[in-house]
Amino acid sequence: MTLKYNPFSCALAMAGLMLGLAGCSVADQIGNLNPFNRGEDIMPGDRRSVLANTGDALAGASLSGSSASISANVALSDWSQPGGNAANAPGNVSLSGGDGALLWRAKTSAKVAKKGVRASAPPLTVGGRYYVYDAGGTVTALAGAGGRQWSVSLKPEGENSLTTGGGIAAAGNVIVAATGYGELVALDAATGGRAWTYDLREPARGAPTAAGGKVYVVTVSNVLHAVNIADGGEAWTYAGIPETAGVLSAASPAVSGNIVVVPYSSGEVIAFDTASGDPKWSDTVIRAVRTAAVSGLSDVSASPVISDGTVFATGVSGRTIAVKLSNGERLWEENVGSAYTPAVSGNSVFLIDLDDNLVALNRSTGKAFWSTRLPVVRKKRFFSVWAGPMLAGNKLWAVSNDGKLISVEPATGQILSDRKLPGPAFIKPTAAGGRLYVLAGDGSLSALR
């Protein structure tokens, strides 16, 4: 295996050494993404954030003079990639009903749920089946109203630990699983039979993305692997800047045409030629002055989105950027960050910022249309966290770790509904076939109208 040298690493590494410390409040929220966080005792005293509140920053910024708008509904039959499609840009997905009522719920990983470790990978909907990858390294296929078709454990023999990295992507009749145990495995979508195994040499950081005959996955030390789907052979690899800390809701690459855009936990966003693996351009979501960031983290934990020739990327360092896909030209940057993949549609970029505000940005300028504070719970041993948004049925949807599902009007930011889910949720909803899907922290998959 030959690793390509990263020509952008030195400058970014030096910049990383100059980053200051951030305050407590945002770190507390992101800390709830940690599946091993059982609610540590919070020290007594008056807690004041030393961060500039993102909502305040937006309020003081020059707001866009127009109104937020979204594109027309798109009938999406499959959610085949972690971000819906290879570009992580599913658009405004059609729903049948759109009121969020529960249709069915199916358990997929009861043993893992009992141990208190949750999955961090989105579920897939492909060809009438639903696929879930859990923290125990098991891929489960469901059909109909959640009936189990097959379940395959990818945990190595003799391995007892659970992991949070990895995930799944679909390519035709193949489900490709990147595991937290250091393997990339191709499974038959109908039977779960193993077709091939590729050695990653270390745990996968997030779910893979499959497109154009290749599957792309990043490991925990920021090595990108491009692997041929047909036979599991290595196409090329690339080593990014190693990063010791990162957010568990890891990002996946985005692919459009002959370019794959890859997010790294170092804060880098690099575009590669899909055929050769040669870098085309590099950018970063790291802020020079980290006044609205998670302490000690520069992670691009949200997947980049490619829409109409523009790459939108964000991270927990507190910056969102828009870049030309073709040449890496920076179009705009805004001092607002997110741990979750933005929803891009119409003239807008929607995201949940690090202060639990749902924000609409002008996709052309980065200026804010509106910012809505989501309902939060702050207790001694529990802080609520929102995951989203998902744009479906002309509404923005988000879920929380205190078991809530809300819908929001995209044009104004008005909260339209607030429903109780069967349990806590940590992964943004997905949508396909007219349904909204929520994977709960206990591994259960719910289908909503």
Which stretches of residues belong to each language-model region?
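C-terminal motif of bacterial Sec signal peptides marking the signal peptidase cleavage site
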Residues: 20-23
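Bacterial signal peptide processing site
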Residues: 25-28
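Blade/loop signatures of beta-propeller domains
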Residues: 42-59, 66-105
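Extracytoplasmic beta-rich repeat domains
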Residues: 104-124, 151-169, 196-211, 234-256, ...
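WD40 beta-propeller blade core
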Residues: 140, 185, 225, 270, ...
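Short loop/turn segments that connect beta-strands within beta-propeller blades
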Residues: 143-147, 188-191, 228-232, 274-277, ...
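Blade-level signature of beta-propeller repeat domains, shared across WD40, Kelch, NHL, RCC1
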Residues: 421-449
